UniProtKB/Swiss-Prot annotation:
Domain of life: Bacteria
GO molecular function annotations of the record: structural constituent of ribosome
Organism: Corynebacterium urealyticum (strain ATCC 43042 / DSM 7109)
Extent of Basic residues compositional bias: 1-19
Alphabetically ordered keywords of this record: Ribonucleoprotein, Ribosomal protein
UniProt record similarity statement: Belongs to the bacterial ribosomal protein bL32 family.
Protein name: Large ribosomal subunit protein bL32
Single GO BP term: translation
Keyword Mitochondrion annotated: no
One GO cellular component term noted in the UniProt record for this chain: large ribosomal subunit
Amino acid sequence: MAVPKFKKSRANTRARRSQWKADNVELQTQKINGQEVQIPRRLVKAAQLGLIDLD
C-alpha cells in the first residue's frame, strides 16, 4: 500500500480534494412509447426495454 513520505499541509490537502467534483450528466431526448423524454444516455436502452418507469 502506498504511504506518503511527507506530511501534506492542510491547504494542499484541501486544494487537492477540491478538484474532485461531480459532473453534470448530459441528457438526451428520446421518443419512448410516443412521448419525448430527456434521460441520461446510459439509461436509454433500459427505458426502451421498459425496465425503468418514466412517469
